[in-house]
Amino acid sequence: MNDTFLKACRRENTPYTPVWLMRQAGRYMAEYMEIRNKYSFLEMCKTPELAVEVTLQPVRKLGVDAAILFADILLPLEGMGIGFRFARDEGPVIENPVRTIVDVKKVRVITPEEDVPYVLEAIKILRRELAGKVPLIGFSGAPFTLASYIIEGGGSKNYIQCKRLMWEAPEAWHELLGKIAESTVRYLKAQIAAGAQAVQVFDSWVGTLSPEDYEKYVLPHSKYVFDNLKETGVPVIHFANNAGSMLELVAAAGGDVIGLDWRVSLDRAWQTVGFDRGVQGNLDPVALFAPKEVIRQKVKEILIKAGKRPGHIFNLGHGIHKETPVENAQYLVEVVHELSSLSYEQLLEA
């Protein structure tokens, strides 16, 4: 079995730096589009056989060191009593946004086996199909990011409704985030029970907050999630996008591995979160549109900053873009494996 990813999560030595890509199963791949042209996005998520096939495509095509379940962070919402749909080119639309204490009271905590059985079934099939070739990562949204969709009614630039509820009705805010946090714990524990060998918690939009607001309104709920996952013994990755101004707080919330975006310098960020945990990242996803020699140089720079310290997982600083040339994604995996196999002295000369 290729267990380099799991070893890196535990900060053990590996022969090379493991690499996988956020959103690695996606629209930049022709194989994905063949399926996507026949089915809606939600049909793909809710049909285990399709989710399995799409999860496996980048493992076969790119040679990545981990598979990540094909799903969406909003899937648990239906079980919480919140309807949503995906509008073409618009992203998710929440049908009944939560904006008052009355709305919050109606939100339920999920029962994963009843509410998202298709996710758990896909994980079970994937473990059989992967047959130990690479580990399988499960995932969920973080409490703040899920709350931002639920309150705003979809994606947002300024998060006005979200921040308004947070500041005007803190009791309602904390009750809502408490329910989301408990749902997240149940969801991830169910994924782990079904066979996920690591999980990632995506806090994609938390960068909209000041460090003070994060600490007061979000950190306790994120910490609840990470504290409750410790007993599973499975590595947990905490990815907080655009959170360079509050990495100490993100690390305080928890996670065995802290995911970094490209806006921070990996060496300084690792020092900030502490060498007692791993880091994941952190190539700018747009670098995959650059010439191969530029990709190679950027990979080299990141690996030098990691300094051959055990516990680095190579990834992009956010999801891969849909227009990315697939051959550049393949090249990225090759060059990470090649350069990270060198000694530090050889890497400097490469």
Swiss-Prot record:
Amino-acid positions noted as binding substrate in the UniProt annotation, renumbered to this chain: R23, Q24, A25, G26, R27, D72, Y149, S204, H318
Biological processes, Gene Ontology terms: protoporphyrinogen IX biosynthetic process
Record Gene3D superfamilies: 3.20.20.210
A single cellular component GO annotation: cytosol
Cellular localization per UniProt: Cytoplasm
Catalytic reaction annotation: uroporphyrinogen III + 4 H(+) = coproporphyrinogen III + 4 CO2
Site note Transition state stabilizer, residues: D72
Primary location group: cytoplasm
Pfam families on file: URO-D
Keywords annotated in UniProt: Cytoplasm, Decarboxylase, Lyase, Porphyrin biosynthesis
Function of the protein: Catalyzes the decarboxylation of four acetate groups of uroporphyrinogen-III to yield coproporphyrinogen-III.
Subunit structure: Homodimer.
Protein name: Uroporphyrinogen decarboxylase
Lineage summary: Bacteria, Bacillati, Bacillota, Clostridia, Thermoanaerobacterales
Underlying gene: hemE
